[in-house]
Amino acid sequence: IKNVKGNESYTVDADGNLVWNADGSDIYYQGTAENSELPVGMQITYKLDGEEVSPKDIVGKSGKLEMTIKYSNASKKQVTVAGEKKDIYTPFLMATGMILPVDKFDNIDIDNGKVLSEGENNIVIAYGMPGLSESLDLKNVDLGDDVDVDTDELNDKITDSVKITADVKDFSMSQTYTVATADL
């Protein structure tokens, strides 16, 4: 592992993790680590008129599109909470952006995100927080009668998946861009 934009060095802790002394600054490095599993991931699935289709088979097709983005989080630690061992995930926010031309995509709807139009294109921003719902375990939280919070509604907003629907003509899609951050 080589620092490519500074002089900061790292040490290896008892668990084999690299620890950088960066004083809050970003570190830019290159190299290969023994454990190459990424902390987060994503998968996009497509349905056209209710039938699941592969990305290569949907190109050029028309119909009712349902695109599902499923984010995943492999970064977790086991901690003790109220005397019980629980898996707590690193709280990542993941956001995906895509540009969908108005001449191919119409009636776009998204359950976790926003659709913005600039005339020729719809800009879709989707978000998810993989692992956060499991870490908070809101289904098993009793807030009492004095707290007026719908935990099911809150749980729906901190989901790890996004569903985008649209009427599509001659399907084609350029790149999607996804960013994950635990630094909010």
Q: What name fits each language-model region?
A:
Residues 1-184:
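Cytosol-facing boundaries of transmembrane alpha helices in integral membrane proteins
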